[in-house]
């Protein structure tokens, strides 16, 4: 490859690293072209799987500010550049590797953090981002409902207290009216007639 072509390839790969939420490095030795095509289909639209040259990709990673991958650029390497959900891509790679043991996950970088192959496997065991967000929203809704109940309880207690005071005053004034009339009648009876 001529120098201008290498420079262009490095720039393209560096841009892939910058635009990706994750980049997973794999060894693809022993996979057929049809298996690689199937893997690309498995990863879907949120990822691009590319066979790369180690030296050029190492330089591109450095240019993109991606660190911690130097030891992974050994042997035949392909990179899954993920622009979508990293968990879904990790699941796709894990499932494909189970069916095709020739695919070996070496490691990668997820949202700027270098990860080992074991960490990528653990990432694949997580639930998808959408499911985790739904669970978080459900937990927050339950917490908010509880908080609303806590805030509403004192208000309803104040309303019940105000109603009880109003009823008590009404019954006191009703009880005081006959007593006041009886007192006036008694005073009138005791008073000498002129």
From Swiss-Prot:
Keyword Membrane annotated: no
UniProt-annotated stretches for the region Disordered: 167-194
Membrane-traversing stretches: none
CDD domains the record matches: Ribosomal_L10 (cd05797)
Low complexity biased stretches: 174-194
Entry GO CC: large ribosomal subunit
Keywords (A to Z) from UniProt: Ribonucleoprotein, Ribosomal protein, RNA-binding, rRNA-binding
Pfam families: Ribosomal_L10 (PF00466)
Coiled-coil spans in chain: none
Domain of life per record: Bacteria
One MF annotation (Gene Ontology) recorded for this entry: large ribosomal subunit rRNA binding
GO biological process: translation
Functional summary from the UniProt entry: Forms part of the ribosomal stalk, playing a central role in the interaction of the ribosome with GTP-bound translation factors.
NCBIfam families per UniProt: PRK00099.1-1
Subunit structure: Part of the ribosomal stalk of the 50S ribosomal subunit. The N-terminus interacts with L11 and the large rRNA to form the base of the stalk. The C-terminus forms an elongated spine to which L12 dimers bind in a sequential fashion forming a multimeric L10(L12)X complex.
Family: Belongs to the universal ribosomal protein uL10 family.
Database matches in HAMAP family: Ribosomal_uL10
Name recorded for this polypeptide: Large ribosomal subunit protein uL10
